[in-house]
Regions:
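Intrinsically disordered, low-complexity Pro/Gly/Ser/Thr-rich segments with frequent PxxP/GP/PP motifs
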Residues: 97-132, 534-551
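Short alpha-beta junction capping motif
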Residues: 196-239, 259-265
């Protein structure tokens, strides 16, 4: 029979109209969703691309006069703007590059927010310049700025330990000429901790846009020994100051403000040439110029005869600044130097090797079971891992600790200007927050050889966040304006004979005699005197010689150059054993650093005002100097207090 095929059954069934419309609607909605997602992704990509390029570097300026002071924190001013219609909110990072081998130290970060089509805005970075090459070369100071989607190579800076500028009004007419470089007044830092390189400031107007922090920074810097030149403005008159700066309105032609000096010169700064500037600033130290070199700043020109006399037979002491931070950091690091039981460790190592082979081989021969061999191997590895960890840890004393040294100079507003160096040793690896209770804190590891896994935020809300592996060290330096008046001294009696101290007694408050080291000194003019405690007072003990004799720069420089930052110092292994020995060893270098003296010529130029004496007390570090982190365990250190004490009567010259 012939089988009939049902054609209707083979034909595709037609769905109802409502079902077809529902599928179309669902497909349409899915297409809309895909389109919406693609639009969002395109928008985000466009925004990301625009924000990545939403930052232009307009200008970059080093220091106060375009240069940097080696072995100090320096100002790096960066002018940025946003030329796009999108806002920019992100971080700009400054980091020191090591040629083509990556970066060193930890990155310094500044948060920046810029409106669309913003006007140029200045951003301040505070970075540490090592400059440890011969002659304080900064050829290795290759800094790079980076942000999301962009970067900028900062020009290599030139060196000037002592910088002199005239503040210019950026909103007014610039007056070119004269011996002093111009610095826009808006760039003056709001922290005294960033003014280490500044020596002289000429002012011809009141900086009305200054913040209270900038005004305080100028007065603190002046109190610590800065020099202000009051000169005529565009109206041919001296500027008149208001508020806290009104102390500069004194009519005295050459007056004192703490250890600083205010001079009034009835002329414009643009009319002061290099020869006149050298005469005005004759008593101030000059930037070092090597043999057969000409100074970039003619103010630093030295009498060739005097220069030859100083350099003859003493060229070594006229080289690089010996008191770089790694000198102090290396000594602090050695206070937690490992003292392992190497004999036991080597014996354990030999036993471990023997148990692996032929131990495991013999075990396999005896039991002929691979599971026994694997168990023996894993057990041996686990056992000796624990043993090596325990024995290795005991070389460090198994305690987290911080060792520090600091230089502290009291300020009249109940605070102290502090330069400090610290070494943190931890037994437990983690990321640690390093912060201090103060104003204008600046951090740096001063590392010249390796990258540091951490970030640094300097200034008002300073923080050093760093990863420290277990049983290892992390060194760092910092500057801070610390709350607290420190010790207070007062002259009770004084007697002078032929311009030198014959008798002196000082009352002391705010510090216990038992917390002070046996060595204390007093500086009058260029001469040091040793002091001793007796009946609750500090009394004159003996004449210790001038600054050159006491500071012993040759020996201190040998100490500095022989000190190896990586922990091994063959020159000091036998003579220096305890932390107390190392604290004592650092006293004279700290004393030189406090005077900003690194060369014989600078020591000869040390000269305090005739109406003050400076007392140096080397004492136990109080709690307010400590890192504000309870996880860092025991903290100990020494502070060199440098206290200026007014005399009842000015000594005869």
């Amino acid at each position: 029979m012939t089988r009939k095929t049902d054609v209707a059954a083979l034909a595709p069934r037609s769905r109802p109209v409502a079902e077809r419309d529902g599928d179309a609607s669902r497909n349409e909605r899915a297409a809309w969703r895909v389109g919406l997602v693609l639009c969002c992704l395109s928008l985000l990509s466009a925004l990301g691309g625009s924000s990545a390029s939403a930052l232009d570097i307009v200008d970059v300026r080093w220091g106060f006069n375009g240069k940097v002071a080696p072995n100090r924190f320096n100002l790096l001013s960066v002018q940025v703007q946003n030329p796009t219609p999108q806002p920019f909110d992100g971080e700009i990072t400054a980091r020191k590059a090591l040629g083509g081998a990556g970066f060193v130290d930890a990155p310094v970060i500044e948060r920046v927010t810029l409106a669309p089509f913003s006007q140029p805005t200045w951003v301040r970075f505070y970075v540490y310049i090592t400059g440890d090459g011969w002659g304080n070369s900064t050829s290795n100071e290759n800094w790079k700025l980076s942000w999301r989607g962009g970067n900028f190579d900062v020009p290599v800076p030139r060196v000037a330990k002592y910088q002199r500028v005239v503040l210019s009004d950026s909103s007014g007419m610039l007056r070119k000429g004269g011996a002093f470089k111009q610095m826009p007044d808006e760039l003056f830092p709001p922290f005294v901790t960033a003014t280490d390189a500044l020596q002289v400031v000429a002012i011809d107007h009141e900086p009305r846009q200054w913040s209270p922090g900038q005004k305080d920074a100028l007065l603190d810097w002046l109190q610590l020994g800065g020099t202000v030149l009051m000169v005529h403005g565009i109206n041919g008159k001296f500027p008149e100051f208001t508020g806290t700066l009104s102390v500069l309105n004194s009519p005295v032609e050459d007056g004192r403000h703490g250890a600083g000096r205010v001079m009034r010169l009835p002329r414009a700064a643009s009319t002061i040439d290099a020869d006149e500037a050298r005469q005005i600033l004759a008593g101030l130290p000059k930037n070092h110029v090597g043999p057969n070199e000409k100074p970039e700043d003619l103010i630093d020109l030295v009498d060739p005869t005097l220069s030859t006399q100083i350099n003859n037979g003493n060229a070594y002491s006229e080289g690089a600044d010996p008191f770089h931070s790694s000198s102090f950091l290396g000594q602090l690091k050695q206070m937690t130097k490992p003292d392992h039981n190497w004999l036991l460790l080597h014996f354990m190592f030999l036993v471990y090797i023997a148990m692996i082979f032929p131990g495991c081989y013999i075990l396999g021969k005896k039991y002929a079971d691979f599971r026994v061999v694997y168990a023996g191997l894993l057990g041996t590895v686990l056992l000796f891992s624990i043993l090596f960890s325990v024995v290795g840890q005991r070389g460090y004393g198994e305690s987290t600790a911080v060792h520090s040294v600091a230089i502290a100079r009291p300020l009249p507003n109940g605070s102290m200007d502090v330069s400090a160096w610290s070494n943190v040793f931890v037994t437990g690896g983690a990321r640690y927050d390093v912060r201090h209770n103060g104003l204008g804190t600046l951090y740096s590891t001063c590392n010249q050889a390796e990258s540091v896994n951490g970030t640094i935020t300097n200034g008002a809300e300073a923080l050093f966040n760093v990863d420290i592996p277990p049983f290892s060290n992390r060194e760092f330096a910092h500057r801070i304006k610390l709350p607290g008046p420190g010790p207070k001294l007062k002259v009770e009696s004084i007697q002078m004979e032929e311009g030198r101290l014959a008798q002196l007694s000082l009352s002391v408050e705010g510090i216990k005699p038992e917390d002070v080291e046996p060595t204390q000194f007093l500086l009058l003019g260029n001469r040091f005197y040793s002091l001793t405690w007796r009946e609750g007072l500090l009394h004159l003990a003996s004449d210790a010689g001038d600054a050159t004799a006491l500071l012993q720069l040759q020996q201190s420089q040998q100490w500095s150059n022989n000190n190896y930052s990586y922990g091994y110092d063959p020159y000091n292994q036998k003579s220096v054993q305890t932390p107390k020995d190392r604290f004592t060893l650092m006293f004279r270098p700290l004393l030189s650093r406090s005077l900003n003296v690194g060369r014989e010529r600078e020591a000869q130029q040390v000269q305090l005002p005739p109406d003050i004496v400076r007392v140096y007390l080397y004492a136990k570090m109080p709690p307010e100097f400590a890192v504000q982190n309870a996880k860092l365990g025991k903290q100990e250190g020494e502070v060199l207090y440098c206290i200026d004490v007014p005399l009842r009567e000015s000594p005869s010259p």
